[in-house]
């Protein structure tokens, strides 16, 4: 391997899990890729000319999770208020949710609801991901 490759590998070995997740998100945004997408020819057609019958059907995702990844310490109160409005969490549960990140705030919601929640949380100062 080249020196540059070795340096990058050493840096990757030293980062935290949260930093690795942020790195993956940035790579996905920068290069327009999806890290969860399979790479290569993992799909094999059935033998005997049944290729059309075994065609891969791609279903569009209909439910999404809203995940708070980070909240700046000076933005915790506004984010806490939004979390309480979006969920049925009481004050103590909402506070625990925004201090133990990343945390799924909404699960199995529609794309429109997820986008609306993301906007509210980001406007309050949170870093949010939809998956």
Curated annotation (Swiss-Prot):
It is found in: Plastid, Chloroplast. CDD domains: Ribosomal_L7_L12. Residues 110-131 have a biased composition (Basic and acidic residues). Gene3D superfamilies: 3.30.1390.10, Single helix bin. The keyword Ribosomal protein applies. One of its GO terms (molecular function) is structural constituent of ribosome. The keyword Zinc-finger does not apply. Residues 107-131 are annotated as: Disordered. One of its GO terms (biological process) is translation. Keywords: Chloroplast, Plastid, Ribonucleoprotein, Ribosomal protein. Forms part of the ribosomal stalk which helps the ribosome interact with GTP-bound translation factors. Is thus essential for accurate translation. Belongs to the bacterial ribosomal protein bL12 family. This is Large ribosomal subunit protein bL12c.
